[in-house]
Amino acid sequence: MDVFEALYTTRAMRRVKEDPIPDNIIKSMIDSAIRAPSGSNRQNWKFLVVTDKNIREKLSNIYRETWDYYINSFLNSAKDPGASSLKKQDDKDIETIKRISNSASWLAENYHKVPLLVLALSRNDPTGSSIYPAIWNLMLAARGHGIGTC
């Protein structure tokens, strides 16, 4: 795949296949991630790879609880006429918000089915910004292997 095609067409894939990801592809994705640039070349990151079904289920419960809290807070703030969440949104914007929210809600309910979770952890960097290129490299590598990410 041409690099520009990947840059222009990669999107968040919240609905992914449940097929296991082979170890060699996981290693390729992580290898791509750790080659990313970082501030002062500190490479101040760790990646936690989770494929175990039981651990994914436990993380799924945490994710679902967090999503429920987030979406309920968002919806409650939207009810407040002075809130900025949905203030001055036209119908197209509201439809986009609903579509994204529905997709994210689906992921929250089906998170345990995602075959691979990669948790990107930043050490000693309160902004976390140095890890972003590494995550993007990982996502592009996944895309190169035909795997969706979000």
Model-derived features: where do they sit?
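Glycine/small-residue-rich phosphate/adenosyl-binding loop
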Residues: 49-131
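Specificity-determining recognition surfaces
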Residues: 1-28, 42-43
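A generic alpha-helix structural signal
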Residues: 26-30, 60-63
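Glycine-rich, charged/polar anion/phosphate-binding loops
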Residues: 31-35, 102-105
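Small-aliphatic-rich amphipathic alpha-helix that forms the alpha element of a beta-alpha
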Residues: 28-29, 33-34, 116-150
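Short loop-to-beta-strand entry elements in the cores of soluble alpha/beta enzymes
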Residues: 40-51
